Amino acid sequence: PKYTFGYWWSRYWQYSDNEFVDLVQKLKSVDIPIDVLIVDMDWHETWGLRKKNPAKDEYGQRIGWTGYTWQKELFPSPANFLRWTENEQLKVALNLHPASGIQPYEDVYEPFTREYGWTEKGKSVPFHIDEQKWADAYFKTVLNPMERQGVDFWWLDWQQWMESKFTPGLSNTFWLNYTFFHHAEQQNPALRPFIYHRWGGLGSHRYPLAFSGDTYAKWETLAFLPYFTATSSNVNYGYWGHDIGGHMFKKETKATDPELYTRWLQYGVFTPIFKTHSTKDPRIERYLWFFPDHLFVMRDAIRLRYTLAPYVYNAARENYDTGVGMCRPMYYDHPERDEAYNVPEQFMFGNDILATAVVEPVDSVTGLAARRIWFPEGRWYDCATGAMYEGGRTEELHYTL
């Protein structure tokens, strides 16, 4: 769907419905567009996780890791919240960790067990997505009611055992991708199906848009992502999203580096999924307006993404038609040139944009950061500076923030 290529707001934090309203209003006030609102796991009851020493359930998960009952202290009226997102023309996704099955304290326990035919009342129902009857009951009684209220898609976040406990050799991640995608396909035949989940191995490109997991917020991570994203096209896995700004901090990191965050946003413009995110850590800040010296540069990056919307959507269509990723290594277009194999940090974004990331801070004296670029044959226009470059050579360029 077109909205997937817009700006996604996400952060693992205990936000209330009113705080989400404030967030969206603030984005509007500084002229930053948004299409997707991700509500991480605190949408549901997480009382077990908030204890000092959280207990574990019979599946080895911390109580509250899996959940399907809205946390009413934060969302007193889920229906009103979802109605508000619809009125704001926002698409909303909820985070799911389904490993602990259906617990007796969940609001959905009675309708699920009745539909499934579970006779051990008062006992949890194990996660068994590879059983048709279980899956049918799960989608019908657990997820469908929330979808009818206004949940647009699911952020599946499977992190537990790799293989099914019931079907030897079956990858849980791959099978979740398959079942959730086809559920979306059947639920709304008139809409393009879409899920957001983890890499499930070769062949998994058929189903999810994927996220690259819990990366550290550091320059080295940003430097690696262009190579990682582009070369994934070699296995037909072109739809990667990253936690822009980095997911988590090293122990010694004191606070968010606004320059790193800005450069990550600038790189993110030229990736398939454009999502800021982080873990629940008070040292990490994702509100752009907390960095007044960088805010307007950050805003320009997000607005550039929207300026490129027709181009991005066309690149996505080409990916659908040909299998060639939106981000692809330089050697796809220039296989005969040795240089194309020696610049893993740069890539083509669609057919006409050569992109890379600035992966070091600006010099304290000059205010510039260096970036070596190999230009293939032709004439190249630098959209950051307005300069023109003749192709067939490598240039060291210098950029302000």
Question: Which residues are covered by each model-predicted region?
Answer:
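Catalytic-domain carbohydrate-binding cleft regions of carbohydrate-active enzymes
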Residues: 1-401
